[in-house]
Every structure is written in C-alpha cells, then in structure tokens.
C-alpha cells in the first residue's frame, strides 16, 4: 500500500501553535526565577529590565482648596476656655448640693459646697492649664518683632513679668498645698511630668534636624547629613534632650513640611521616613496634651476630695473620658490640618504597597528580585527575603518587608481616612451626650451636658465642613485639573 505522509502529532501541534511565553510577557520572568520545564530545569531566556516592560506613569495629585485653620493663639485661647468650663463642671459634679431643700444647713442655700473646695488646688490647676496659652502669647509677641529699642525692651520686660507672675502663683499654691495635704496626695500633682520624661526624652529622633527641603539635593549628601545628625543626637546628654523636648513642647507653631514629588526611590523613602517621624511626634504631642488636660481637669480634683464627701463616681469617670476624647479631637484637628493630611497622602501615593503572597501561587508568572533603585509598576511580582510580594500601588518603592511602610500606606493612601475617623469619634460623642441629656434627671447632669455640647458643636462643625469640601475636591477628575492648567 502506498505510504501516506503522516501529519504532525497532537503534541507537536499544540506546542507549535502556542507563541513563546517570552513574547507574551516580554521576557520579564527573570532575575533567577525564569521558566521551568517538566524536568524542573530552568529555561534560559534573556530578561530585560522591569522598566522595559511597563513604565509607571507619573503620580497625579488632586488640588485642594485652602481651608481656614485657627491660629495658634486663638486655638490655645479656645482650648483654655474649654478646659476651664469642664473643670467648673467637674467641681459641680463633686460639690453639688440640694439647694432647693429647706435651709437646715448653711451650705444648702447655695448650689455648691464652697467651703469644701480647695481654692489653692483650683489655682494650681488653672496655672497648669494656661501654660500653653501663656507660651503662645509670648511666641506671638516675639514674632511681631520690635520696631525700636524701646519696644524691644518693653517686650522683654512684659515676658519677664508674665513668666514671673505665673511662676510666683505656681509656687504660692504649691506651698499652701504642702501645708494642708499629705505627701501621698501631693504626688498626684507631678505624675504627668513623670510620664513626660520617658515619653519625650528617651525616644528622641532627628525630626527637628531633618527638613524636607533637603530632599532636592543628591542622595549622597542626604545620607551624610543623616549620619552626622545621628551622631550628634547620640552624643547629647540627658539634660540637653530634656531642654530640647521642653522647648518643642511649648513651641505651638510647628511648621508644616512640603512635598517635592521626588523621582528617586531613595529620596521617596527618605521623605516618608521624615514625614513618619514628624507624624509620630505630632501624635505623641496630641496624646500627651490630651491626657495632661484630662488628668488635671477631671482626675486631680477627685484625688483631693475628703473621705466624708460623697460624689457620683460613675458620672465623674464618664466626664473624665469625655474630656479626654474631646481634647484629643481638638488637638488632632489643630495639629493635623487638611494640608498636612494631603501631604501625607501624596507621599503615600509615591511610596506604594506590597502584598505578601503564599508559596505555590503564581509559580509560572514572571518574578523579579526586588531592587531598591527600581520603581515597580502595579501587579509586578518580586522576591524579597525569601518571600513573594505583589505590587499594589501604581508606584511602588517601599521595602516589602518593612511593616512601617505598609502602615504608612494604609493610613494615608486614602486622603480622608483620618478626617473620617475624627468625625466618627466626635459624632459618636455628640450623639451619646444628646442621649444622656434627654435621659438626665439631675440638674448637674443636664448643666454639664449642655455646656460640653456647645463646645463639641463647634468642633463637629469644622470637621463636617472640611469633609464636605475635601470630599468634593478629591472626587473631582484629575483630567479636569490638567485641562484647567493647560
């Protein structure tokens, strides 16, 4: 029989019909991973750099309007008035009387037991609460400058008189408190300072020495400056750190850094480190000052109450928690304004994020060895520290194994995350206070809730105003900004 020409086998046909994987992915499976055949041997394919595969486009930022922010002196004045109001409310909760009863006791003719109030303690608390306002007043007067020698001399004398008066009142109240109270009670007066020293002095960073304007220089100069700053910070003694931290504590006018949109991955990471240190310092200042205010306003008066005096412990503790939450939100709103949160959002957009993958997945996908000098596009798989990661952001220069980079991206890649959290906290407090106001049966509960609500309405109004304006600004298409700019 005549032999027929046999066609290609099914296996050969399937192999010849498929294009090469190098053509599909552009040869991007490289840097030691590559493709493997059935025997497990690697197929040597030429691997172009990652930038030849996909070039990440430039990061485009939204333009937000300049929202009004309270000045340092005005905010400190409002914050001081708020603390005085809640201090007055706490004294009402402790020393209230049933003044509508018949006059069987001399104290029942007044709404408070004024003869039980320690006025030296009240004066001491007032001076401690006014420390930020006094320093803000001095700072604003110093910024104004002196037009003549007489003006400068009068300014110096006014500062000396003001500081001397505050110091004299503080010493006078302390001497009288030492005479009338035990040593155990007096230890409560300085407890926040015992927390302040380890919080600020033992965890000093180089935030005050690193400026974001330094990121425009070359990377080598930045590294040399950082190493010099680190050696200077390590050579400081404890007294220098204490004085520096006290100066930063009283300096309310903290400048907001700027964003320079760096193109180098090293510069982006350095900018993130500086912003992260600055953000941690601001949060530390918010936590300390809010706890400091709540401690002296709501907790310290309870420590000096006589054992024979009855007061509602649950309501006083609830008042303490409310004061701390409100102070925390007010300080956070002032120290983390919208411009600052937008700056953190822009830096997070340049940083990117990596998602850790389990072993066994994406075994046939192109994989790369992570390099610190590469800007990785979205969806790229890299290997770092024997783990597999996938790029999640449009720009990715973060270290895959660095948890702090992942936290930074999680907090700030959405620009309204911090603002939404503050609105949720303050709104929950306001709704709870309204509910307590409706169900209150005692006159001191009604008065305290009504006064605090007036203060919280102002804070909630500012938060909602910023949320509405920024929400519309961030939802605006980026192409519209480009057309408007052109």
Swiss-Prot record:
Gene Ontology CC entries for this record: endoplasmic reticulum membrane
Annotated glycosylation sites: 31
Listed transmembrane segments: 72-92, 110-130, 155-175, 182-202, 285-305, 317-337, 418-438, 444-464
Superkingdom per UniProt: Eukaryota
Location of this chain's protein in the cell: Endoplasmic reticulum membrane
GO BP of this protein: autophagy; negative regulation of autophagosome assembly; negative regulation of autophagosome maturation; positive regulation of viral genome replication
UniProt KW keywords: Autophagy, Endoplasmic reticulum, Glycoprotein, Membrane, Transmembrane, Transmembrane helix
Function: Regulates autophagy by controlling the spatial distribution and levels of the intracellular phosphatidylinositol 4-phosphate (PtdIns(4)P) pools. Modulates (PtdIns(4)P) levels by regulating the ER-to-Golgi trafficking of the phosphatidylinositide phosphatase SACM1L.
Family of the protein in this entry: Belongs to the TMEM39 family.
Quaternary data: Interacts with SACM1L, SEC23A and SEC24A.
Protein name from the UniProt record: Transmembrane protein 39A
Gene that this polypeptide is encoded by: Tmem39a
């Amino acid at each position: 029989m005549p032999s027929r020409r046999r066609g290609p086998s099914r296996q050969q046909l399937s192999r010849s019909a498929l294009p090469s994987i190098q053509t599909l992915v552009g040869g991007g499976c490289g840097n030691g991973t590559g493709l493997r055949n059935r025997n497990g041997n690697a197929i040597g394919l030429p691997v172009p750099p990652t930038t030849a595969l996909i070039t990440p486009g430039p990061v485009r930022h939204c333009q937000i309007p300049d929202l009004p922010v309270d000045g340092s002196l005005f905010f400190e004045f409002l914050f001081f008035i708020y603390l005085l109001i809640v201090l007055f409310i706490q004294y009402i909760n402790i020393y209230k009387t049933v003044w509508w009863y018949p006059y069987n006791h001399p104290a029942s003719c007044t709404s408070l037991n004024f003869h039980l109030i320690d006025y030296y303690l009240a004066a001491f608390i007032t001076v401690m609460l006014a420390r930020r306002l006094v320093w803000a007043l001095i700072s604003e007067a110093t910024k104004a400058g002196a037009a003549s020698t007489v003006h400068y001399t009068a300014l110096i004398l006014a500062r000396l008189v003001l500081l001397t008066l505050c110091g004299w009142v503080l010493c006078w109240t302390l001497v009288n408190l030492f005479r009338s109270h035990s040593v155990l009670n007096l230890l409560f007066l300085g407890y926040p300072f015992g927390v302040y020293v380890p919080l600020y002095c033992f965890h000093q960073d180089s935030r005050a020495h690193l400026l974001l304007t330094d990121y425009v220089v070359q990377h080598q100069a930045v590294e040399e400056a950082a190493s010099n700053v680190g050696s200077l910070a390590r050579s400081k003694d404890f007294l220098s750190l204490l004085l520096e931290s006290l100066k930063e504590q009283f300096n309310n006018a903290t400048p907001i850094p700027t964003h320079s949109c760096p193109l180098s991955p090293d510069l982006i990471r350095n900018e993130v480190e500086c912003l992260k240190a600055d953000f941690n310092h601001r949060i530390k200042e918010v936590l300390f000052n809010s706890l400091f205010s709540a401690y002296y306003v709501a907790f310290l008066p309870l420590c000096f109450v006589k054992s024979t005096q009855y007061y509602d412990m649950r309501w006083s503790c609830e008042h303490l928690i409310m004061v701390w939450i409100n102070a925390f939100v007010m300080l956070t709103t002032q120290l983390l304004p919208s411009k600052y949160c937008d700056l953190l959002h822009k830096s997070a957009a340049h940083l990117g994020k990596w998602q850790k993958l389990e072993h066994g997945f994406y075994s046939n996908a192109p994989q790369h060895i992570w390099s610190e000098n590469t800007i990785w596009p979205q969806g790229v798989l890299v290997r770092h520290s024997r783990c597999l990661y996938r790029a999640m952001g449009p720009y990715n220069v973060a270290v895959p194994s660095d948890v702090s980079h992942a936290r930074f991206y999680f907090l700030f890649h959405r620009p309204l995350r911090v603002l939404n959290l503050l609105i949720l906290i303050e709104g929950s407090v306001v709704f709870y206070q309204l509910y307590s106001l409706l169900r209150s049966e005692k006159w001191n509960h009604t008065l305290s809730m009504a006064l605090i609500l007036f203060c919280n309405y102002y804070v909630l109004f500012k938060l909602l105003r910023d949320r509405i304006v920024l929400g519309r600004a961030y939802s605006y298409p980026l192409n519209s900004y480009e057309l408007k700019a052109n």
